[in-house]
Amino acid sequence: MTKTAAVIGGGPAGLMAAEMLAKAGVSVTVYDAKPSLGRKFLMAGKSGLNITKDEGLEALLEAYGAHSEEMRPMVSMFDSSKVKGWVRSLDQPIFIGSSRRVFPEAMKASPLLRAWFARLDELGVICLARWKFKDFNGGGLEFDTPDGPQTVQTDVTVLALGG
């Protein structure tokens, strides 16, 4: 029987969690309170969408200062080369600027986000906007939705609530 996952939050962390879960064979639904998903990602793209730096692991970790060792396991699993590879896997060419920052050639977020949504759709991920998470209730998740209150049962819940 296929496991189900609810990802609450449609920003980059939630979308990445949805992608990884779907690739692992989990049936995923992403819920977001806003009218559309990826809104902060689009805002970040207004300044060119610096996606990573073209640096090795140790140089990347230096950016985390006193927290570099705490971040090492995560950054090691998804380092600069993997971030660049992920963007390229969405058929989005990249370039490396003089500061070693890496950008999509389009210099904006919308083409990358559209390609990401297309991939999620191909993986069977369902994305629901205007579903505001309210509470956990008896093993279910309570949402306020455009059609009124809804309760969702799921095997796994990922909270990707952003900041």
Language model feature labels by segment:
Residues A22-K46:
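Glycine-rich FAD pyrophosphate-binding loop
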Residues K46-I96:
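Glycine-rich active-site loop/strand segments that organize a redox cofactor
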Residues A66-M71, R88-R114, T154-V156, A160-G162:
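Helix-loop-beta segment of a Rossmann-like dinucleotide-binding subdomain
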Residues K3-V30:
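N-terminal Rossmann-like FAD-binding beta1-loop-alpha1 element of flavoenzymes
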Residues G10-G11, D32-K34, G45-K46, K53-D54, ...:
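Fold-independent oxyanion-binding glycine-rich loops
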